[in-house]
Amino acid sequence: MICSRWFFFGWLIVLVSFTSSMINAGTGSYALGFFIVPMGDELGISRLQFSFIPLFKLLTIPILPLLGVLVDKKNGARILVAAGSLIGGIALAATSLVENIWQFYITYGVLYGLGTAAMGSQLVGPSLISKWFVQKRGRAMAIGTMGISAGGVIIAPIAGLTISAMDWRSGWLALSIVTIVAIVPPAILFIRRAPEDIDLLPDGGTLATEEHHISYEPEVISWTLIQSLKSRTFWIFSLIQALGICGLVPVLFHEIAYIQDKGFQTEYATIVAWTLALSALISKLPFGFLSERMDVRKVLALCLIPAGISTFLIIPATSLFTLLLWGIIHGFFMGGFPTIMGVALPTYFGRQHMGSIRGVISPIIIVVSSFSPLLGGILWNDDSSYKSAFVLFGTTWIIGGLLPLALGKPKPPDIQNSDIRIGL
């Protein structure tokens, strides 16, 4: 197994998480905006009909807790990511052939939704990184979640440029090829559940390394799923996650169309979206290091409140310069959110059952990420403007940034009334 003084196998886990997050976010959020106008023109799909697409993710809710349990099982994550990526890639190829809205709903909404649920960039990747890293968790989570922003920096331009040079059908086909080639082989080769499975400890220690054993000891006590569900802290974190997603997803979903509504061509909208994604990518490492050194509650507030305020800046923007400025500022603060949440959960609940815990939080994320873009489409239909929608989404960020103040410090679970034996 690959491990030496200079290299830790866990960084391969981070690499796969980065790639999976990049493809998932790129094809599911950043790139989708480029298809709204051309598919709408050719197939007669309205903005509101496009906004229904995320609702099909609701079909995956019953299986998400089960997928979370599988992540905590040996070889479960490897099978999930490889199979999900293959299904997702095939679904994207099928989307290039659609002729009406219902075919689009089936191929992209249902089939691709099932594939990405199994791919689990926000379930599998952060859960595995939590298991493989403790002292270096902030930086590892930052690099892994950089893939989310890389979806906008790398995957979205692939879609946008392919559509501009060819057509939207070629755009879907290009995304299909990238999904299968970039994820399936690395997932099969590199994904392992936890360092203990290959006689290692988190952060690069071995079972015989006393120094790492000492640093590993505080992480031994982990909350089970049942203990977590009985905790007030768990539900506050779930609400913070929901509010952050409500501010993040619909802005990514509608930003391209909003910029085009302001009179800018697709190429300029691509530049703004790319700038936002690049800024979000760059911000993850600083927020990751802050999460290792500061109280994670303060880091959450430092990220979410400015993310909300900066959301409002796109509303008065009327020039390319002001749009680029918005992309830089909002992208920086918005981009730190997945990294900080990835660190916060294992900081409070430990790492052993993180897959099961995230498997319960994931349905909440799915519901919010499904309905919030639809709400944006409804508000646009009311007055042909996204102004009220962006005010609402910015406000959810700010509320989410205030909630960490209601959290106490991390503490061990109360085991008196919990059954630890079942590991749930």
Question: How should each PLM-predicted stretch be described?
Answer:
Residues P54-V69, W274-P286:
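Central cavity-lining transmembrane alpha-helices of secondary-active solute carriers
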Residues G28-V37, I226-F287, S372:
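Extracytoplasmic gate region of multi-pass secondary transporters
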Residues Y112-M146, G350:
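Cytoplasmic helix-loop-helix junction between adjacent transmembrane helices
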Residues W172-L189, S388-A406:
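Symmetry-related core transmembrane helices of the 12-TM Major Facilitator Superfamily/SLC fold
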Residues L86-E99, P306-T318:
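C-terminal ends and interior cores of transmembrane alpha-helices
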Residues M22, A91, Q103-M119, T322-G335:
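Hydrophobic core of transmembrane alpha-helices in multi-pass small-molecule transporters
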Residues L64-G76, S283-D295, W380:
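Helix-to-loop junctions at the C-terminal end of transmembrane segments
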Residues I148-D197:
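Helix-loop-helix hairpin linking two adjacent transmembrane segments in secondary transporters
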